[in-house]
């Protein structure tokens, strides 16, 4: 029996493992193994909702082991550290517990076909101080860290206001501005914009849960973008509409502003200016992990992505595929396939078909990315975007309730790929029930 190993359980990796398990694993044509450093899967485009407490990671995450049991693939927890192409195995680092004790030793996982789907991480562009003084939103662990710090900040702010009321200012805790909670977000892409909107919405809800007289006026978000406009993937008119919406919420948007250094509670701009904040998030650009440099001579580009052919096979080794954000595939227009969830979803389907073809001794097919458009959610305020128009050259502009429905449907499509029609219907029902049974925000 052949071994098919998928490294990375993100949007593309877990969908691919599900497709392969349901066919090759079920029919015992291959042993399908999924490898990930975490025990659970969470759809990365929704990490900003985990960060603000809108989404509960405990409810919305998916156990790899449980999902594998239901879809005929096995799961190995661990981080890949290298590939041996000659002997055809991947080496995984040991797994350690919270107390630092080793739970699982280093292992070698043999493969006949290997798929790398390790995604991407925030690109700090080697900016001084960013790693030490900023929070990234690349994982649920980082999103939860942000959420805990956010709740602590609002608790401090609420307590300071209460001390003002009773005249005991000497006990107040220090914030960069005693009149507001200040948060700086670097990066005017989808993550930065959506996080900004969710923060203002969360601030409005906190007063309902015992945080005192807090509303969105108590929050100041500074959104910093090095380019000339927000959301460059959107048409200019929609980018301008997003800018207007954020400003109406109270956001301080700084365009054409490059950050050269991050210090504790301070960002330094290229012109020498300072941006003070109680909490700083870095969401500017992405790159693949440097671990790809240890992949036994596979071709990588300047941001560590694995260069692949149109069949999604790596240029050096036909038995190794790469999909999602970690794959560099040049399209016919000369541009790389963008690092988006919809690209990972399409690549997972195409890769599964090509692996099926290998088992059936059939020719592999070329992958062609179909850009279906871009959607951005501004929390409960609105949503907008542009969708590909099959009947004309100009994209369709969508806004409001239809755009919100389309945005939510992207996540439902991912869930459908994992669970099928019946289970996704039950999941939607449970989600609706949870709106009535649970608080709007996760407060712990």
From Swiss-Prot:
Keywords for this protein: Cell inner membrane, Cell membrane, Electron transport, FAD, Flavoprotein, Membrane, NAD, Oxidoreductase, Transport, Ubiquinone
UniProt-listed Enzyme Commission number(s): 1.6.5.9
Main localization of the protein described in the UniProt heading: membrane
Protein name: Type II NADH:quinone oxidoreductase
Its membrane topology: Peripheral membrane protein
GO cellular component: plasma membrane
Residues spanning the membrane: none
Flavoprotein recorded as keyword: yes
Organism whose genome encodes this protein: Haemophilus influenzae (strain ATCC 51907 / DSM 11121 / KW20 / Rd)
Catalytic function, reaction form: a quinone + NADH + H(+) = a quinol + NAD(+); a ubiquinone + NADH + H(+) = a ubiquinol + NAD(+)
Cited Pfam families: Pyr_redox_2 (PF07992)
GO MF entry, a single one: NADH dehydrogenase (ubiquinone) activity
Places the protein is found: Cell inner membrane
Top-level EC class: oxidoreductase
Co-factor(s): FAD
Residues reported in the UniProt entry to bind NAD(+): 186-191, 285
InterPro entries assigned to the protein according to its UniProt record, in alphabetical order: FAD/NAD-bd_sf, FAD/NAD-binding_dom, NADH-Q_oxidoreductase
Lineage of origin: Bacteria, Pseudomonadati, Pseudomonadota, Gammaproteobacteria, Pasteurellales
Cofactor stoichiometry and binding remark: Binds 1 FAD per subunit.
Similarity comment: family membership: Belongs to the NADH dehydrogenase family.
Binding site for FAD: 8-12, 38, 120, 325, 341
Functional note: Alternative, nonproton pumping NADH:quinone oxidoreductase that delivers electrons to the respiratory chain by oxidation of NADH and reduction of quinones. Utilizes NADH exclusively, and electron flow from NADH to ubiquinone does not generate an electrochemical gradient.
